[in-house]
C-alpha cells in the first residue's frame, strides 16, 4: 500500500474510529474467544503496525513469541489468524483442511487471475477442483518435469554456465538475481510456450518487466482489500489504473502466445509445451478449460516458476557464501562424483545427497514463501494447542502460516539460525510432500503447490553446475563477512541488497 494512500486512510479513519470505540465490544462465541494478539486501534485494527514493519514476516515472528502459535490481528474489519507451529499448521492444513481451504479474493489476485480461474489464487469451488486435477494429472507431473522437459533444463543451464564462463574470464562480477532470473525465465518460457523468451520478438526486457510488475501487483495490498468503503483511494492514488495496465499487458501477452499455437503452419515440436497440452484438453467435450482459464493458469506458471526458482538460487548462494565450510564440502561432493565429465546432468542429482540437503536447508532458513499464500476460512472451527487453550475461528478469517517462524523455532530445530545441511542427512523422513509439518516449503493439504517437481529440478540442476564449474568469491573490496541476509517484503522472499558474486573457473588437476 502506497504512503499517500496510508495518509488519506488514517485521516478519514479518525472520526469513524471515535464512533467505533463507543459501540464496539469484543464478543465471545460459545464461551470461546479468538486467539490472543497485539492490541490494535479502533476501526483500523493493526493496520498501522503492519504497515510500518520493514519485514512483515519478521515482525509476525517476533509477535508470535509473545502471543503464541495462534495469534489474531485485524486489518480494518478483516480478522487475520497467524499460525506459527507445526502442530497448528497440521490442524489448519490437514486435520481441518476443508474449513481453511479457500483463498481471499485480494484485488490484485482477483484481477490478474481472471476472477479466480487459476489454481493458486482461486477460492475453493468445483471449478478449482477441476483445474487442480488437470494441473496435477496433466501439466505438472513428475514425468513431464524430469523426462519430457529434461533437455530444456540441461540446455538452459549449459547456456547459463557458458555465459558465466565468459564473465569469469573477464574477471567480472555477477548480479545473482539477474543471472538466475534469466535462467528461470528461459526455462519457463520453453516449458510454457516452446521457445526462449528472447526469441522471435518476445523480448527479454519486455517479459522481465512484465513479470516484475506482476509480482508487485500480486504482493501489494489495496485499500479496498481491508477497507471497502474507502476503495476509491486506490483510484485516487493510481493503483487501480496501474493494476489495469498490468492486466491488459499480460492479457495481450497470453493472447499472442495462444494465437501463435493456433496457427496452422506452426512447426510441430517433439515435446508438447504447456499451451499445447491446454489446447488439446480444451478441445475435449468434457473440458471446462476456457481461454481465460488457460490465461489464468499461465499466470501461475510464470509467477510461480520464475521468481521462486530465482529467489531460491540467490538464497542458496547467499548461504554458501556466508558459510564457506559448507560451500567447500558440497563442491567436494559434486566434483568427486562427477569427476572430469564436464557438467552435471539430471541423472547425477540423486547421487549428490549433500547438495540436496543444502537445497532443503536453504528452504528451511530462507523459505521462498516466508508466509504461505493466505487461506480464507469458509466455516467456523475450534482449534488450540491443548484443551486449556482452545479458540473459535470464524468464517472469512484470513489465515497465514508462517514458515519463517516455524523454520527458525529452537524448539523444533537445533541451532535454527545456523546453516547446517547435515540436519537433513540425519532426517531422511523429511521431504517436500507436506507430511512433516515442521517442513512444508511448498505448503500442504489440498492446496500444496502442484509445481514442486518442475521448480526443484531447475534449482538442483542449476546449483550443482554452478558449484561444479566455478569457485565463488565476493567482489573486489568486499569480504565474505560483508554478505548479509536481510530481507524485504514480497510474495517471494527477496534479499534487501542484491547479491554480487565473482565466478572463478575451477581447473581440475
Swiss-Prot record:
Membrane topology: Single-pass membrane protein
Pathway linked to the protein: Secondary metabolite biosynthesis
Pfam families hit by this protein: p450
InterPro entries reported for this sequence: Cyt_P450, Cyt_P450_CS, Cyt_P450_E_grp-I, Cyt_P450_sf
Region described as Substrate specificity: 368-373
A GO MF term: oxidoreductase activity, acting on paired donors, with incorporation or reduction of molecular oxygen
Protein name, as recorded: 5-OH-xanthotoxin synthase
Species per Swiss-Prot/TrEMBL record: Ammi majus
Species classification: Eukaryota, Viridiplantae, Streptophyta, Embryophyta, Tracheophyta
